From Swiss-Prot:
<dbReference type="GO" id="GO:0003682">
    <property type="term" value="F:chromatin binding"/>
</dbReference>
<feature type="modified residue" description="Phosphoserine">
    <location>
        <position position="456"/>
    </location>
</feature>
<keyword id="KW-0804">Transcription</keyword>
<dbReference type="GO" id="GO:0045638">
    <property type="term" value="P:negative regulation of myeloid cell differentiation"/>
</dbReference>
<dbReference type="GO" id="GO:0000122">
    <property type="term" value="P:negative regulation of transcription by RNA polymerase II"/>
</dbReference>
<feature type="compositionally biased region" description="Basic and acidic residues">
    <location>
        <begin position="399"/>
        <end position="434"/>
    </location>
</feature>
<feature type="compositionally biased region" description="Basic and acidic residues">
    <location>
        <begin position="442"/>
        <end position="453"/>
    </location>
</feature>
<dbReference type="GO" id="GO:0001711">
    <property type="term" value="P:endodermal cell fate commitment"/>
</dbReference>
<keyword id="KW-0832">Ubl conjugation</keyword>
<keyword id="KW-0539">Nucleus</keyword>
<keyword id="KW-0805">Transcription regulation</keyword>
<protein>
    <recommendedName>
        <fullName>RNA polymerase II-associated factor 1 homolog</fullName>
    </recommendedName>
</protein>
<feature type="region of interest" description="Disordered">
    <location>
        <begin position="361"/>
        <end position="533"/>
    </location>
</feature>
<dbReference type="GO" id="GO:0071222">
    <property type="term" value="P:cellular response to lipopolysaccharide"/>
</dbReference>
<dbReference type="GO" id="GO:0000993">
    <property type="term" value="F:RNA polymerase II complex binding"/>
</dbReference>
<dbReference type="InterPro" id="IPR007133">
    <property type="entry name" value="RNA_pol_II-assoc_Paf1"/>
</dbReference>
<comment type="subunit">
    <text>Component of the PAF1 complex, which consists of CDC73, PAF1, LEO1, CTR9, RTF1 and SKIC8. The PAF1 complex interacts with PHF5A. Interacts with POLR2A, TCEA1, SKIC3, KMT2A/MLL1, SUPT5H, RNF20 and RNF40. Interacts with UBE2E1.</text>
</comment>
Length: 533
């Protein structure tokens, strides 16, 4: 073979193969890009995860008032496309004895899907979450036609278990049967645990609503940490926290916060004396409480969105178990001290008990009626009494003569007609005001929660009247209220406070402390005078 001559340029080209000569990628941007850095590669392979939640949860549409008030024009035919024969009413009468066509009978039959009992198909439909699929595009169906997508492997809750556990009653008969079954199940004796066969009951007690304490609204108070004082522990700390009180206050800048008050030693002695004498409180005694902590508060009640119902149980020996409702949930978080703002650590709460007023008694009657599932019907009771009186009067008139009978019958007829008219008016007013009552109940509940924490104007007016009476009755400068003074003078404020107890113990108070969070609830209607330096 003849020799060949290779130049220097050909040698350099030989070391650079043609496969490495790539043209620059064409950009999809029309204008010239100054910085054309390409995106980095994805660090991991894509994962096809099923999104278990509703995709419309973040884009819920809410119509404005302008759209709601706009009236669209409906251009339709006079008969709306339905020709009605007003002359012959038998035209649309249905004959119940007519036999349906076989094709129509099939359409009316309910579709019942028979469960597949093939063991091979069940084994084939199993999903192994740790095994990776070898195909990029999967139809999620196998040759047996059973879906390979299991809700149990989805992120979130088990959707399949949620639907299988809920029994859906489609007709009225099934609902009645289910309700009757609950009464039959309640009569059966409990021999073992519903899910643990080896667990047997030690004692079986009936569960009833707490008719005695339901009239008092209870609140659940959740602390971010243990509110017990650092210098005490054990039984002494539990005793102090069981008698603690929370009260809404306001600092110099006008910011509201919740103060946590603990009883002083003298108050503990008085409460112990009252317990030994089997009395709730001494009418003439004054109980002092000192401030221990300051908290920011967050209140949720039935009117709040996303509120979950909460109940607590009271065990009474020899009587049974009673449950009550916690209609308000208060979360307290520690309040940070601000620079230049005077702290209320020297505040003193003076508590003096009083009898409930008419407004509070009416609220208790309303809660009792709510538990009994009906509202107090005072008007109906008065009507029944008047009818009985009229019936008694008519008997006497029958003995006297026939003329009085005629007059009494006419009066009764006129009275019954007026009662019917009044009943119709009451029903119409109840229907028209049902929507307003629901909204007013939510607003009243929110206002009552704020009133229980921060007090009300009506209580302050009542307290001012009681101050005038105390000044007129005081002799020798003696007073039940104690003031705390400072070098520059003290500020004195009086207010009424109401606090309720969610205690399952007969003593009337409960407090449970934990490391991460503790819950407390406070009981009883009281009059509180707060003196702060």
């Amino acid at each position: 073979m003849a020799p060949t001559i290779q130049t220097q340029a050909q040698r350099e080209d030989g070391h650079r193969p043609n496969s490495h000569r790539t043209l620059p990628e064409r950009s999809g941007v029309v204008c010239r890009v100054k910085y054309c850095n390409s995106l980095p590669d994805i660090p991991f392979d894509p994962k096809f995860i099923t999104y278990p939640f509703d995709q419309n949860r973040f884009v819920q549409y809410k119509a404005t008032s302008l759209e709601k008030q706009h009236k669209h024009d409906l251009l339709t035919e006079p008969d709306l496309g339905v020709t009605i024969d007003l002359i012959n009413p038998d035209t649309y009468r249905i004959d119940p004895n007519v036999l349906l066509d076989p094709a129509d009978e099939k359409l009316l039959e309910e579709e019942i899907q028979a469960p597949t009992s093939s063991k091979r198909s069940q084994q084939h439909a199993k999903v192994v979450p740790w095994m990776r699929k070898t195909e990029y595009i999967s139809t999620e169906f196998n040759r047996y036609g059973i879906s390979n997508e299991k809700p149990e492997v989805k992120i979130g809750v088990s959707v399949k278990q949620q639907f299988t556990e809920e029994e859906i009653y489609k007709d009225r008969d099934s609902q009645i049967t289910a309700i009757e079954k609950t009464f039959e199940d309640a009569q059966k004796s409990i021999s073992q645990h519903y899910s643990k066969p080896r667990v047997t009951p030690v004692e079986v007690m009936p569960v009833f609503p707490d008719f005695k304490m339901w009239i008092n609204p209870c609140a659940q108070v959740i602390f971010d940490s243990d509110p017990a004082p650092k210098d005490t522990s054990g039984a002494a700390a539990l005793e102090m926290m069981s008698q603690a009180m929370i009260r809404g206050m306001m600092d110099e800048e006008g910011n509201q916060f919740v103060a946590y008050f603990l009883p002083v030693e003298e108050t503990l002695k008085k409460r112990k004396r009252d317990q030994e004498e089997e009395m709730d409180y001494a009418p003439d005694d004054v109980y002092d409480y000192k401030i221990a902590r300051e908290y920011n508060w967050n209140v949720k009640n039935k009117a709040s969105k996303g509120y979950e119902e909460n109940y607590f149980f009271i065990f009474r020996e020899g009587d049974g178990v009673y449950y009550n409702e916690l209609e308000t949930r208060v979360r307290l978080s520690k309040r940070r001290a601000k620079a230049g703002v005077q702290s209320g650590t020297n505040a003193l709460l003076v508590v003096k008990h009083r009898d409930m007023n008419e407004k509070e008694l009416e609220a208790q009657e309303a809660r009792k009626a709510q538990l009994e599932n009906h509202e107090p019907e005072e008007e109906e009771e008065e009507e029944m009494e008047t009818e009985e009186k009229e019936a008694g009067g008519s008997d006497e008139e029958q003995e006297k003569g026939s003329s009085s009978e005629k007059e009494g019958s006419e009066d009764e007829r006129s009275g019954s007609e007026s009662e019917r008219e009044e009943g119709d008016r009451d029903e119409a007013s109840d229907k028209s005001g049902s929507g307003e009552d629901e909204s007013s109940e939510d607003e009243a509940r929110a206002a009552r929660d704020k009133e229980e924490i921060f007090g009300s104007d009506a209580d302050s007016e009542d307290d001012a009247d009681s101050d005038d009476e105390d000044r007129g009755q005081a002799q020798g400068g003696s007073d039940n209220d104690s003031d705390s003074g400072s070098n520059g003078g003290g500020q004195r404020s009086r207010s009424h406070s109401r606090s309720r107890s969610a205690s399952p113990f007969p003593s009337g108070s409960e407090h449970s402390a934990q490391e991460d969070g503790s819950e407390a609830a406070a009981p009883d209607s009281s009059e509180a005078d707060s003196d702060s330096d």
